[in-house]
Amino acid sequence: IKSNYCFVHGDTLSTLLGSFFVKRNRGNLVLLEAGHPVPGIFKHFPESVIRYIVAKISNKLIVNGESQINQLKKWNVKGSILQISTNTIYDSFIGVELNQNHNKNKVTVAIHRTENINNKIKLKLLVNFLVQISEQFDINWYLHIPTRNKLKSYNLLDELTDGNVKTLDLIQYDEFINELFSSEFVVTDGAGIVEECQLIGVPTLVWRDE
């Protein structure tokens, strides 16, 4: 670790723990997609806090826009900022073959942010919405483990099943991109999925306040 650069990405707990491990071992920490603007340090908690902490301790920060640079300047980061032309998400698309078969009745759902899954009222509103539109669309909800656990603890899984909403385990990246691509629209709270849908031209309903 001491002689190499270690790259981290995102705003999850694993991002934070990995960053602490690198710094503890005196490694050089590189943060990809650094400086995404946040509405407030304690909004989108804990994601915004994680973004801030990791940015502050990174040696190098990779950005692809002026808004990210401005955010990092507001945070007064000490690491060097390197601007690239496009988001690193483009690299993920290399080698992904898109299936041209579209299902105009399918809606793909991916919800995982803490602000949504830890709030029973918000999660119940989402479940009600999905059950309502399931009369018109085939709903496939790909569940992260924390999301599934919260739905179970709130006794909402049965409501989804009774409402003909399919709850599925996560799948491989290229398979998931094709699920997005073949959907009529996507419901998500993930910034990465929003960008992916923009790249492949799929309408997206962003399920978060800001």
Describe each PLM feature range.
Residues 55-119:
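A nucleotide-sugar donor-handling region in carbohydrate enzymes
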Residues 25-26, 133-137, 200:
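Helix C-cap/helix->beta junction micro-motif
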Residues 101-182:
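Donor-nucleotide binding loops and adjacent catalytic segments primarily
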Residues 1-76:
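Active-site and donor-binding regions of nucleotide-sugar-utilizing enzymes
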